[in-house]
A protein has these predicted regions:
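Acidic, PIN/NYN-like endoribonuclease modules and their adjacent C-terminal/linker elements
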Residues: 30-31, 57, 102-160
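Active-site-proximal, substrate-binding regions of enzyme catalytic domains
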Residues: 1-92, 99, 110, 150, ...
């Protein structure tokens, strides 16, 4: 099980790789704010990835859960903060792409990773080729995924 923020769900759904979360982690838990961000707002904007994420919720492998303890974290979005709280509650990995959110999660003692971790794990488990992972990252970047040159180079080094 993992707790995911909106960005990894959107990025992976846009490139047709959302299924990797189910293959690698079994169940994904998201908070209601993340559902609003990914599905409701996405559908309002006509984003096809919103329908892919909605189907995963309907299929039951992405579960929506409300965070009981509402807490505001300085410098990060509500969805990231709620993802951190869910990961803490379930004692699982938090999937967050934004660096500020990742730092807060780490400060709270959580193991935090991002979308590239999913692709790296998919290569390690034989679910995706190295070339396929590189093409997927390039496609994600083309769809608006922001990544530093340093992190991109590290990803390429890690999967080789």
């Amino acid at each position: 099980m993992i707790a995911s923020d909106a960005s990894p769900l959107i990025c992976l759904a846009k490139v047709g790789k959302l299924y990797l979360l189910r293959e690698l982690f079994g169940k994904v838990v998201i908070e209601e704010e993340v559902k609003r961000e990914t599905i409701e707002r996405g559908k309002e904007e006509g984003a096809p990835d919103a329908l892919v994420i909605e189907d995963a919720v309907k299929d039951g492998w992405i579960e929506v859960e409300k965070v009981e303890e509402v807490k505001s974290f300085s410098g990060i979005h509500k969805g990231e903060g709620n993802t951190i709280l869910l990961a803490k509650k379930h004692e699982c990995l938090a999937l967050i792409d934004e660096e500020d959110g990742r730092e807060v999660g780490r400060a709270m003692g959580l193991k935090v990773r991002g979308s590239l971790h999913v692709l790296k794990k998919a290569v390690e488990k034989g679910l995706m080729s190295k070339d396929g992972a590189m093409r997927t990252v390039d496609e994600m970047i083309g769809d608006g995924f922001r990544i530093s040159t340093r992190i991109y180079a590290k990803f390429l080094e890690d999967i080789r």
